[in-house]
Amino acid sequence: MEQRGWTLQCTAFAFFCVWCALNSVKAKRQFVNEWAAEIPGGQEAASAIAEELGYDLLGQIGSLENHYLFKHKSHPRRSRRSALHITKRLSDDDRVTWAEQQYEKERSKRSVQKDSALDLFNDPMWNQQWYLQDTRMTAALPKLDLHVIPVWEKGITGKGVVITVLDDGLEWNHTDIYANYDPEASYDFNDNDHDPFPRYDLTNENKHGTRCAGEIAMQANNHKCGVGVAYNSKVGGIRMLDGIVTDAIEASSIGFNPGHVDIYSASWGPNDDGKTVEGPGRLAQKAFEYGVKQGRQGKGSIFVWASGNGGRQGDNCDCDGYTDSIYTISISSASQQGLSPWYAEKCSSTLATSYSSGDYTDQRITSADLHNDCTETHTGTSASAPLAAGIFALALEANPNLTWRDMQHLVVWTSEYDPLASNPGWKKNGAGLMVNSRFGFGLLNAKALVDLADPRTWRNVPEKKECVVKDNNFEPRALKANGEVIVEIPTRACEGQENAIKSLEHVQFEATIEYSRRGDLHVTLTSAVGTSTVLLAERERDTSPNGFKNWDFMSVHTWGENPVGTWTLKITDMSGRMQNEGRIVNWKLILHGTSSQPEHMKQPRVYTSYNTVQNDRRGVEKMVNVVEKRPTQKSLNGNLLVPKNSSSSNVEGRRDEQVQGTPSKAMLRLLQSAFSKNALSKQSPKKSPSAKLSIPYESFYEALEKLNKPSKLEGSEDSLYSDYVDVFYNTKPYKHRDDRLLQALMDILNEEN
């Protein structure tokens, strides 16, 4: 009997626990003001019930026939308790088979949850890839990256896409590259064989191609180096820079296996010395044209080009015919701080920007390096272009049917203005697009680009048209110092013809200009709707009397505009060199675009940057667009060192003009070694710590300043610093677009440590 009583007590306690648990679950629920009901009478009966019982009929539930959703007119939106009396009244109606008040349900995605982006990969340098994920060293830096991780989370990693790097070779057996190496995308045009392996030397001169390839396709989760932007893509290397470069070699490289290679990445070009004007030869130009017409089975090869590192030399990438080509996507750089680096060039042909190195103290780019090593010091626009190529590979995996012009439109329409808004020079063109001669249309946004490229919604852009505008009666116009030539160019943009243009893409101004000092010319073009673009800025170091011969100045700044109306060309020389003279001999305006507006452009561009929410700009230095008074050679030599008896206020007043204090002999010796490094033979012994400096302290002081801040000297054709840089960079006629001086400094620091 006692046993039976104990059993009953246990049973009662168990029921009590279950009842408490059920009520506890209900207590945690959030009931909403919605009731689902099954009503066999259909829509008419449901409407009648709603009117009689004080509900709003929200409609049928999905595809379920005779199932309807109601909202009560006098019930709160959410409640922790269910409204049993309302539910009972509804379910008691003879026309209702079943009724239930709705409540919130907790659901979680069945993906692997990571604590942070830092835990995504086991590659040791992944946490240093700040440009792919936010790993700010200080809170003052903006929270910015290229927004690649959300694309990876969709499973898009570059699979099936082939990229080749045109450079000085590829260490294809590198642990972090080998799994993604594609021999069919590789060739050695320097030695004329199928192996692009780089030539080793004591200075590791030929590391550039391997570094660029690593940025694109470093393998993920293999405990080596970092992670490539398109880490499941295939990558090849074209060895063509480690030897004599000819037009034929360039053409062969640019046009290598276009039926197999999707993207060509190039981080080199003519000398960025501020005085060279050069572009593709006849053969290379034909290779570009063939690539966009026949490459990728007629969809067009994607050519990605680094915009150039001649900023400190006052160079202008409109004088570089590779970045100035309508067939290339020209990519510039932004620093970790979201600012334009001191080496970056300004021009009207730059389409967009990705990240790279900035000031001496900023983080640089991580990649694979020679001898199966890794690096975190890849620099310059050399490092920016491969990141862009990797992003384009993600887009091609998402939509393999994109054409070469589709890719350019995607870049224009999704690149971000907001992350770089602190920089001067932004303007809105006639199509409502923000554009800047430093950054093109802004910072690449991988997620936005891939989302827009979705094959379910993307429509290929209309057929490309070309309209040539010229004045057959034009007579040569003379130009002198402090003078100007203004040419008004009315056009109907081939209206009524098969090649009529209503929506612009590229604009080319082809001209022959004879002038006694080419670098003093300034050329602007103003579109029919008023967008003014600098086609050529002055270049202090360009003293050539050769002018321009049928040179194409290209601009993307009027993208999306209607070209109909009067354009205005203005050529000036404000140098004050009264001996200057010349003339504009002939010209023509070449409009590229479409006869109808592309589908994605029928609604205005809305700038809703993902960075707007993430980026805390507090503490981020703002750039001010002012012209600083530049020191003359005389004043620089007279004020190099801060006197010991100078007052603190005087020192503070000169902070923008010079670094306080005398540079240490250790730093001067470091710079001396960097300048001398390329001149040393393989057998030359290292300089001893007590070696005498062969370059004056004053010149080092100037060089040290210009590592972080470019400037020119009034009253002299070239600065001493520029002379040293010319010597430093004179090893090859074609220049890698990394920062070799910074690389040399870093190498020496690493050796000493």
Curated annotation (Swiss-Prot):
<dbReference type="GO" id="GO:0030141">
    <property type="term" value="C:secretory granule"/>
</dbReference>
<dbReference type="InterPro" id="IPR022398">
    <property type="entry name" value="Peptidase_S8_His-AS"/>
</dbReference>
<feature type="glycosylation site" description="N-linked (GlcNAc...) asparagine">
    <location>
        <position position="401"/>
    </location>
</feature>
<feature type="signal peptide">
    <location>
        <begin position="1"/>
        <end position="27"/>
    </location>
</feature>
<feature type="compositionally biased region" description="Polar residues">
    <location>
        <begin position="633"/>
        <end position="651"/>
    </location>
</feature>
<dbReference type="Pfam" id="PF01483">
    <property type="entry name" value="P_proprotein"/>
</dbReference>
<feature type="active site" description="Charge relay system">
    <location>
        <position position="382"/>
    </location>
</feature>
<keyword id="KW-0865">Zymogen</keyword>
<keyword id="KW-0645">Protease</keyword>
<feature type="disulfide bond">
    <location>
        <begin position="225"/>
        <end position="374"/>
    </location>
</feature>
<dbReference type="GO" id="GO:0005788">
    <property type="term" value="C:endoplasmic reticulum lumen"/>
</dbReference>
<dbReference type="InterPro" id="IPR015500">
    <property type="entry name" value="Peptidase_S8_subtilisin-rel"/>
</dbReference>
<keyword id="KW-0378">Hydrolase</keyword>
<dbReference type="Pfam" id="PF12177">
    <property type="entry name" value="Proho_convert"/>
</dbReference>
<dbReference type="InterPro" id="IPR022005">
    <property type="entry name" value="Proho_convert"/>
</dbReference>
<keyword id="KW-0165">Cleavage on pair of basic residues</keyword>
<dbReference type="GO" id="GO:0042802">
    <property type="term" value="F:identical protein binding"/>
</dbReference>
<keyword id="KW-1015">Disulfide bond</keyword>
<feature type="active site" description="Charge relay system">
    <location>
        <position position="167"/>
    </location>
</feature>
<dbReference type="GO" id="GO:0030070">
    <property type="term" value="P:insulin processing"/>
</dbReference>
<dbReference type="InterPro" id="IPR038466">
    <property type="entry name" value="S8_pro-domain_sf"/>
</dbReference>
<dbReference type="InterPro" id="IPR000209">
    <property type="entry name" value="Peptidase_S8/S53_dom"/>
</dbReference>
<dbReference type="InterPro" id="IPR032815">
    <property type="entry name" value="S8_pro-domain"/>
</dbReference>
<feature type="disulfide bond">
    <location>
        <begin position="467"/>
        <end position="494"/>
    </location>
</feature>
<dbReference type="GO" id="GO:0004175">
    <property type="term" value="F:endopeptidase activity"/>
</dbReference>
<dbReference type="Pfam" id="PF16470">
    <property type="entry name" value="S8_pro-domain"/>
</dbReference>
<dbReference type="Pfam" id="PF00082">
    <property type="entry name" value="Peptidase_S8"/>
</dbReference>
<dbReference type="GO" id="GO:0016485">
    <property type="term" value="P:protein processing"/>
</dbReference>
<keyword id="KW-0968">Cytoplasmic vesicle</keyword>
<feature type="domain" description="Peptidase S8">
    <location>
        <begin position="129"/>
        <end position="450"/>
    </location>
</feature>
<dbReference type="InterPro" id="IPR002884">
    <property type="entry name" value="P_dom"/>
</dbReference>
<keyword id="KW-0106">Calcium</keyword>
<dbReference type="GO" id="GO:0005615">
    <property type="term" value="C:extracellular space"/>
</dbReference>
<feature type="domain" description="P/Homo B">
    <location>
        <begin position="460"/>
        <end position="597"/>
    </location>
</feature>
<keyword id="KW-0720">Serine protease</keyword>
<dbReference type="GO" id="GO:0030133">
    <property type="term" value="C:transport vesicle"/>
</dbReference>
<feature type="propeptide">
    <location>
        <begin position="28"/>
        <end position="110"/>
    </location>
</feature>
<dbReference type="GO" id="GO:0034774">
    <property type="term" value="C:secretory granule lumen"/>
</dbReference>
<feature type="region of interest" description="Disordered">
    <location>
        <begin position="633"/>
        <end position="663"/>
    </location>
</feature>
<dbReference type="GO" id="GO:0043043">
    <property type="term" value="P:peptide biosynthetic process"/>
</dbReference>
<dbReference type="InterPro" id="IPR023828">
    <property type="entry name" value="Peptidase_S8_Ser-AS"/>
</dbReference>
<keyword id="KW-0732">Signal</keyword>
